[in-house]
A protein has these predicted regions:
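Early transmembrane hairpin of solute transport permeases
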Residues: 22-91, 104
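Accessory "access/gating" subregions that flank catalytic or transport cores
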Residues: 170-254, 258-282, 286, 394-402
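Conserved phosphate/anionic-ligand binding catalytic regions in large, soluble enzymes, centered on
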Residues: 8-26, 226-245, 287-295
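C-terminal regulatory domains involved in ligand/effector binding and gene-expression control
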Residues: 69-203, 211-212
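Alpha-helical support elements that line or immediately flank enzyme active sites
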Residues: 19-32, 243-254, 299-307
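Functionally critical mobile loop/hinge segments
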Residues: 302-402
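Contiguous, well-ordered alpha-helical segments that form the cores/surfaces of helical PPI scaffolds
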Residues: 215, 219, 240-250, 265-273, ...
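Short beta-alpha connecting loops at secondary-structure transitions
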Residues: 10-11, 281-286, 331-340
Length: 402
């Protein structure tokens, strides 16, 4: 299992799988062919179906075009067997002869993969345990918590990296709360974060608390939709959940930054378990793998901050994911706006509820986090492609008919 640095990726929106991943792939291909006369890039499946809305072509062209002309070919009806987000890069010489064809897949969260023989294009594994049942047992045997397991496995600079992650998350909230106007794209969707923030301050504490959480999640998600700088947690489409929960708890409970970083480490571990054993790609398993996993991560982080035991933390995360099972990924017009932005706000509130629910228990429950991850994976594979980031079904289809 990889470092949580590869889960928390700092970059620009609107999509980790459709923008960040293709941009990274283009950069890698350019390094191999800096003298190419031209490039041809074929996008398949979900990448082609919603690539325009996610600015996939823009990310690739911005990277390659300064070197040579780029042709983009769209194949939304062709799904390569390894993953729905496939793309083939071709480098051509001055005689239009192909120098190399390279097929690569954007598998979610900004990560890339080539095929079953070379599944990941990343750094080596750093975790020796790959499911939460084993890690929970380790916590019980050693008396340590999840973040301490992260500390044992990661390099020493992990805390510096998480500090940068936290700073980026807070900056996105601050920018989003100040920004006004309309988000990019044909929906002409107005930003709401600043309005929610102002209105929330006028309520008494109980309602104010929930309104502020909404405003923070909206702020980050709207920044992402505008192509702003955010952190995948675990994806761009779900990037508002974790910052909203952690920022709210730090402001309301005065948690020091180091405790927030430990909560980020714990949340990252849970997100990593899902990424390794299932998927965090909306094109592969639907929105349950994005917003659902973000809710699980935020639930675990919140429960740790409030002193939860390893069993209670695992229970909070399990509920955060379980109650998003079956959630479809059906972005209207292929944009990370409707229903994505509102879902971030709701998931942040759900994470706080999962934390509270777990806090009232001793952590004992029937359905384990690992089991829910397995069910999420199977549910995602059972979902038709209509509901997995193709904008051909669900809300996206109904919106076209309105």
């Amino acid at each position: 299992m990889k470092s949580i640095k590869e889960l928390y990726r700092i970059g620009t929106g609107p999509s980790s799988s459709h923008t960040m991943g293709p941009r990274k792939a283009a950069e890698m291909f350019l390094e191999r062919h800096p003298d190419a006369a031209s490039f041809k890039v074929t996008l398949y499946g979900s990448l082609a179906a919603t690539g325009k809305g996610h600015m996939t072509d823009v990310a690739i062209i911005d990277t390659l075009h300064p070197t040579a002309p780029v042709e983009i070919v769209w194949q939304p009806k062709v799904f390569l067997p390894f993953h729905p987000n496939g793309m083939t890069f071709a480098a051509l010489d001055s005689n239009d002869k192909v120098q190399e064809n390279w097929t690569v897949y954007s598998i979610g969260g900004g990560a890339l993969a080539e095929n079953n023989d070379n599944p990941t294009i990343e750094s080596p594994d750093v975790y020796d345990m790959e499911n939460m049942t084993e890690i929970l047992q380790w916590c019980e045997d050693t008396g340590k918590s999840y973040w301490e397991y992260v500390k044992e496995c990661e390099e020493e600079d992990i805390w510096d990296y998480l500090a940068e992650v936290w700073a980026t998350m807070k900056d996105a909230i601050h920018r989003g709360l100040e920004a006004e106007g309309v988000l990019p794209g044909p929906l002409n969707l107005r930003r709401k974060a600043s309005t929610y923030y102002i209105r929330a301050t006028g309520y008494k504490q109980s309602l104010q608390s929930r309104g502020l959480v909404f405003s923070y999640a909206l702020a980050v998600s709207e920044e992402n939709a505008s192509g702003g700088k955010i952190v995948t947690a675990p994806t761009c489409g779900s990037c508002g959940v974790m910052p909203a929960v952690l920022y709210h708890l730090q402001n309301s409970r005065d948690f020091r930054d180091m405790r927030i970083l430990r909560a980020l480490a714990t949340a990252g571990l849970f997100g990593n378990i899902v990424k390794f054993n299932a998927s965090i790609s909306g094109a592969e398993v639907g929105c349950q793998g994005e917003v659902g996993v973000a809710c699980a991560m935020a639930s675990a982080a919140a429960n740790q901050l409030f002193g939860g035991s390893p069993a209670q933390i695992e229970y909070a995360a399990e509920m955060g994911l379980e109650h998003h099972l079956g959630m479809t990924c059906d972005p209207v017009c292929g944009l990370v706006q409707i229903p994505c932005i509102e879902r971030n706000a709701y998931a942040a509130a759900r994470a706080l509820d999962a934390n509270l629910y777990s806090a009232f228990t001793d952590g004992m429950h029937r359905v384990s986090f690992d089991k829910v991850v397995q069910v999420m994976k199977q549910t995602g594979h059972d979902l038709p492609s209509l509901y997995k980031e193709t904008s051909e079904g669900g809300l996206a289809k109904d919106y076209k008919q309105m």
